[in-house]
From Swiss-Prot:
Residues involved in Mg(2+) 2 binding: E298, N300
Protein name (database record): Carbamoyl phosphate synthase large chain
The protein's enzyme class: ligase
Purpose of the protein: Large subunit of the glutamine-dependent carbamoyl phosphate synthetase (CPSase). CPSase catalyzes the formation of carbamoyl phosphate from the ammonia moiety of glutamine, carbonate, and phosphate donated by ATP, constituting the first step of 2 biosynthetic pathways, one leading to arginine and/or urea and the other to pyrimidine nucleotides.
Length: 1070
């Protein structure tokens, strides 16, 4: 079938901000789709609210709208651009839900817009739990016994019939949001209430729990001619009951017999044909390990997280081909871009094993509930490829960057028996390490299988790894065992620990017997056809398939798995750096291990190595490629942390030298540099013991800001207001010693300002100055950033430009740097300098039209800013206002405090752009998911220090028609200021409390600032959690509340009675 010529313009809907359950995989899918459609000659219009994505670059579509993905804004874009069709299946759950909303509102009919890929009927059949169950019954495919419920009474009726445990699956939600396994009535009430609130159609499926079955996924494709094929099948190591996004996954499946594989394959193809999906689809199935019985769990009628994994695991570009199928091309017409000779209907064949391990943010959220279930909690994932499951697993473990280079975690090894049993029987994010610890203590694989239902095959493989560990320890420096260990995926670092030598000694041992990895090609066809894919993985075999080209090359280190503090922004910079290297005439090589990202699309670079970002693994690639140098500025702290080890092995680090990087990151060296440059910073010192920290704090005065040196995302950073609190921090939050000092600074409660700059060593370009809405003390990644700065005087701006220029040249920066300042009146203090790319670089690149990573890379390669066409100094400011608003995933992480502070908590961001600050903020808030009510009730409960400021906010809320509700202390303050207020009871009082009002939907906005003391802290935490779980916006900073208020005021109107009166009535606004 030829591609369709009756459509000219296609609207692609993106997935919006990064949240748990919907991450960088949709930037990868959307980028592929836009390029694929443009390749076919279509005019592409894109809407996405996330500025930190490659897909929102101007080159990716004919028209790019960085606007909220809401019915209002997408309808406006459709009416303006008049697309012939929309493609929603590459924008995750956001894209599907938006297509359904547009249809329900009549916009698609009104503007005569066709839905491509998966039609609305198929979306409804797959996403609506009742329609899906009915379809499976029609097809004769088994689903677990279930019922559709719309309220708690219906849930009780179902449970009375089949008993506990039951699984709750809300309709039209992402990453299992609101769902879970319920073992008792209390869990049922909590989960069903949450699920019904989060489901856009107030619908949940309750089903009999089949926890313990094997969970298997099939990634399938279908075209308009009803050709269908399996791209990849994947097996979850964890059985049914844990969300697939939180499971360790292996591809291809390892424990299915041929009969089981074919049985489930046939079911998957039958389902995609029944749904008449044109494109990609993910089918999840549960298989009884003791029989051939199976159930269909669910179908994602779109490109998904698993699609990205399947694409990277096989090399088969699912999103690219799904876009071509959506416009009428068929699988037997489209060439497989991997081989260039075969067609897309050939099913990929793997002669290697792929392991995926999820990455969690529990290092940031120590109080979070780490228990895994049907609601996803991982922020990202890593993938590794090997010739065996053991090798792939161990490579994936060391890719996680959790301080483990092997299946060995200190907490697991030192756990008492009760903790060990709990961690094995009730799975958390680190269960893999506790399984290894149990095997070391002598538990059998049969015992572990009985407790976990993990297949004996995987437990057997783990036990063989532990057995090999023991032989390694018993035979120090034995060459045969060394070779066996390397083939099994063991790292030099772990072997060095076993033999009590350093890593270099292990390397020398390997060198003596020429024991080095070779690189194999990912070619989709197990070498059956000739392939030229520049996509490689390492393994210890004989034949090497990666050969160095004659062209000079540059290696760019990626940023690894997405986590809080190091997100998709760094992948954005990595991709742009690669393109700049290619433009400069060099071969660009990427090393990375994240299957979700654009950077690990093999078509982006000249060569892709899918490898752990450890010194050993990176050095192996360097030895074979012999690059001109390595770029570390764009891979976040992951890449920066490797720089020292690489330099010591003679590798040239391109850009800012190691010594100068250390001067920026090492506190004492940085203080000396600031002294020489005569740039002020808040008073502070480095402490290497608890006593020293107390002395420093006493000298400079409380409150103080404390943080460990060399961190990203403000990990373990805190504002401390007393000696008691400081002692608690020093003994609980950090392990302080001379090798790991802690920084103690005077806390300046001023206005925070952020600057990204590029330096060529002589000239410094400053694309823009951003101010934060929230005052200093809230992490920059969690603050609302505004460009151009609205509240800074010309004098302050000139000072910032002067300090930035002095810092860049004084620290000998070559490439990018990010500086954070605090402004107190007209005084400017530098807080920190990061000699690398930052999370604001994509945002600033988009709005200033200065491609920062590209320009910085050209500078790193030796060019200067003036020759590249840039004038040093501050770039001319834009007339429009741009805001970057953080997005949080608190609804997925129960028990996490939503209050903002120096430790970063946001998972993503959105952009708002308009002619006024209020309009830009409105777009930003709406795009972030904040519900903006024009009237309602504001609950105020604030700390004593904030009460005076809260009075002014309450007056303004009252003036535009909001009702004010407050707890006793805050209410008294408001009453004294003659502000009408309803006093509500605190938590624990016998009558109806503020929690009841929140749960009953009587509150539209909560403003709650942190109060010290155990009881107020506990109450504040409960208020904030209840607000999040009931979908109510909660502000823990008065600055954020004021920003929301500004927006609401801008949307209100003056209302004044025309009656004349001797007593002049105050104006009211609503």
């Amino acid at each position: 079938m030829p591609k369709r010529d009756d459509i000219k313009t296609i609207l692609v809907i993106g997935s919006g901000p990064i949240v748990i359950g919907q991450a960088a995989e949709f930037d990868y899918a959307g980028t592929q789709a836009c390029l694929s459609l443009k390749e076919e000659g279509y005019r592409v219009v894109l809407v996405n609210s996330n500025p930190a994505t490659i897909m929102t670059d101007a080159e990716m579509a004919d028209k790019v709208y960085i606007e909220p993905i809401t019915l209002d804004f997408v309808s406006r874009i459709i009416r303006k651009e008049r697309p012939d069709a929309i493609l929603p299946t590459l924008g995750g759950q956001t894209g599907l839900n938006m297509a359904m909303e547009l249809s329900a509102a009549g916009i698609l009919d009104e503007c005569n817009v066709e839905v491509l890929g998966t039609d609305l009927t198929a979306i409804k059949k797959a996403e609506d739990r009742e329609a899906f169950r009915d379809l499976m019954n029609e097809l004769g495919e088994p689903v677990p016994e279930s019922d559709i419920i719309h309220n708690l009474d219906e849930a009780y009726t179902f449970v009375e019939r089949i008993g506990y445990p039951v699984i709750v699956r809300p309709a039209y939600t992402l990453g299992g949001s609101g769902g879970g396994i319920c073992h008792n009535e209390q869990e049922l009430i909590e989960t069903v209430t949450s699920g019904l609130k989060l489901s856009p159609v107030t619908q949940c499926l309750l089903e009999k729990s089949i926890a313990g079955f094997k969970e298997v996924e099939y990634e399938v494709m279908r075209d308009a001619n009803n050709n269908a094929m399996v791209v990849c099948n994947m097996e979850n190591i964890d059985p049914v009951g844990i969300h697939t996004g939180d499971s360790i996954v292996v591809a291809p499946s390892q424990t299915l017999s041929d009969r089981e594989y074919q049985l489930l394959r046939d079911v998957s193809l039958k389902i995609i044909r029944a749904l008449e999906i044109e494109g990609g689809c993910n089918v999840q199935l549960a298989l009884d390990p003791d029989s051939y019985n199976y159930y269909v769990i669910e179908v994602n009628p779109r490109v998904s997280r698993s699609s990205a994994l399947a694409s990277k695991a096989t090399g088969y570009p699912i999103a690219k081909l799904a876009a071509k199928i959506a416009v009428g091309l068929t699988l037997d017409e489209v060439r497989n871009p991997v081989t260039g000779t075969t067609f897309a209907h050939f099913e990929p064949t793997l002669d290697y094993v792929v392991a995926k391990i999820p990455r969690f943010a529990f290092d940031k959220f120590e109080q979070a509930d780490r228990r895994l279930g049907t609601q996803m909690k991982a922020t990202g994932e890593v993938m590794a490829i090997g010739r065996s499951w053991e090798e792939a697993l161990l490579k994936a473990v060391r890719s996680l960057e959790i301080g483990a280079d092997h299946l060995l975690l200190e907490e697991a090894e030192n756990a008492d028996e009760a903790t060990l049993e709990r961690k094995i029987c009730f799975p958390e994010d680190d269960r893999l390490f506790f399984l290894a610890a149990a095997l070391r203590r002598g538990q059998t694989i049969e015992q572990l299988h009985a407790k976990t239902k993990i297949d004996l095959f995987f437990l057997y493989k783990l036990s063989k790894t532990i057995e090999l560990e023991n032989r390694i320890k018993e035979n120090p420096q034995n060459q045969e065992i060394l070779a066996e260990a390397k083939r099994a995926g063991f790292s030099d670092a772990f072997l060095a620990t076993c033999w009590n030598v350093d890593e270099q000694a292990i390397y020398d041992l390997r060198k003596a017997q020429n024991l080095f990895p070779v690189y194999k090609m990912v070619d989709t066809c197990a070498a059956e056809f000739e392939s030229t894919t520049p996509y490689f993985y390492s393994t210890y075999e004989e034949e090497n398939e990666s050969t160095r080209s004659a062209k000079e090359s540059v290696i760019v280190l990626g940023s690894g798995p997405i986590r809080i503090g190091q997100g998709v922004e760094f992948d954005y910079a990595t991709v742009h750096s690669v393109w700049a290297i290619q433009q400069a005439g060099y071969e660009a090589i990427i090393i990375n291990n994240n299957p979700e990202t654009v950077s690990t699309d093999f078509s982006i670079s000249d060569k892709l190595y899918f490898e752990p970002l450890t010194l050993e693994d990176v050095m192996h690639v360097i030895e074979i490629e012999q690059p001109l140098g390595v770029v570390v500025q764009f891979g976040g702290q992951t890449a920066i942390n490797l720089a020292d080890g690489l330099a010591k092995r003679g590798v040239k680090i391109l850009g800012t030298s190691l010594e100068d990087t250390d001067r920026a990151e090492n506190r004492d060296a940085f203080e000396k540099a600031l002294g020489i440059l005569q740039i002020p910073q808040p008073a502070g010192k480095t402490a290497t013991s608890v006593e020293e920290a107390i002395n420093v704090a006493t000298d400079i005065g409380y409150p103080v800001l404390v943080r460990p040196s060399y961190v990203l995302g403000g990990r373990a950073m805190e504002i401390v207001e007393s000696e008691e609190a400081l002692k608690h921090y020093m003994t609980n939050a950090v392990k302080v010693n001379p090798k790991h000092p802690v920084l103690v600074d005077r806390y300046v409660s001023g206005q925070e300002v952020e600057v990204d700059a590029i330096s060529d060593g002589e000239n410094v370009l400053i694309p823009g100055i951003m101010e934060h809405i929230e005052r200093a003390g809230v992490h920059s990644g969690d603050s609302i950033a505004v460009y151009p700065a609205q509240r800074l005087s010309s004098q302050v701006k000139n000072t910032i430009v002067d300090y930035t220029t002095r810092l860049a040249t004084g620290l000998n920066i070559i490439g990018m740097l990010n500086i954070q300042y605090v402004v107190d009146g007209e005084e400017v203090f530098v807080i920190e300098v990061n000699p690398r790319s930052s999370r604001t670089a994509p945002f600033l690149s988009k709005i200033t039209e200065i491609p920062m990573a590209n320009v910085a890379t050209r500078v790193i390669l030796g060019e200067n800013l003036i020759d590249l066409g840039y004038t040093p100094g501050l770039a001319p400011e834009k007339q429009e206002i741009f805001v970057k608003v953080p997005v949080f995933s608190f609804a997925k992480l129960r028990s996490v405090d939503t209050s903002l502070g120096p430790e970063m908590k946001s998972t993503g961001e959105v952009m708002g752009k308009d002619v006024t600050l209020e309009k830009a903020l409105y777009k930003g808030f709406v795009a972030s998911g904040t519900t903006m009510h024009d009237y309602g009730t504001v609950l105020l409960t604030v700390a004593d220090r904030d009460k005076e400021e809260a009075v002014e906010l309450a007056k303004r809320f009252n003036r535009i028609g909001f009702t004010i509700m407050a707890t006793k202390g805050t209410a008294s303050t408001l009453e004294e200021a003659d502000i009408p207020v309803s006093q509500v009871k605190k938590i624990g009082e016998n009558q109806e409390t503020l929690i009841d009002y929140i749960r009953n939907g009587q509150v539209t906005l909560v403003v709650n600032t942190l109060t010290t003391g155990k009881r107020p802290e506990r109450d504040g935490f409960q208020i904030r959690r209840e607000s999040v779980e009931n979908g109510i916006p909660v502000c823990t900073s008065l600055d954020t509340a004021e920003a929301i208020l500004r927006v609401l005021e801008s949307r209100s109107f003056e209302l004044e009675s025309m009656n004349t009166s001797e007593v002049k009535q105050p104006k009211a606004r609503v």
